[in-house]
Amino acid sequence: MDKYKVLLVDDEEEAIEAIRLKLEWETLGFEVIGSANNGVKALELVERLQPDVVITDIKMPYMDGLELARALNEDYQNIHIIIFTGFDEFEYAKEAVHLEIEEYMLKPINSQELSECLKRLKKTLDNEREEKLNVKKLEHYFNAVSYTHLTLPTKLEV
């Protein structure tokens, strides 16, 4: 099965590299497909790369992580968002809950904690993928049944 695509967003290149190197992404069922150093660039990459997951910092220039999350929720409802930050502020956490963020983590990122988060997220993504597949199967079935009904004669002659 295909790996789920992840976009990393942080204005600190070292943070992106640390996250990229801390995990065995492939083993967890994910692949890092790109990174951006602010929310504006992240939106451009989201449009082009269509990630399943965006992992973003909050404090960044031009567009912060919460603004990015708002934009993603508006235009890309299927993308799951994980926020990490160095700021332990209640208002950020409250806004993250309001935006239905998948997970809110404090820096420095603990690889075990992020790994567990991604395992839970993979189960969610697998379930979503399975539901979409089931819907397609049902649509195919109902289309076939509808077609069959359309081709039957409306009047039987004896």
What does each of the following model-derived ranges do?
Residues 10, 57:
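Active-site residues of response regulator receiver
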Residues 27-37, 45, 93:
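Short hydrophobic/Thr-rich beta-strand motif most characteristic of the beta2 strand and flanking loop
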Residues 38-41, 64-67, 85:
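Acidic catalytic/metal-coordinating carboxylates
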Residues 44, 66-77:
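Short amphipathic alpha-helix used as the core "switch/output" element in two-component signaling
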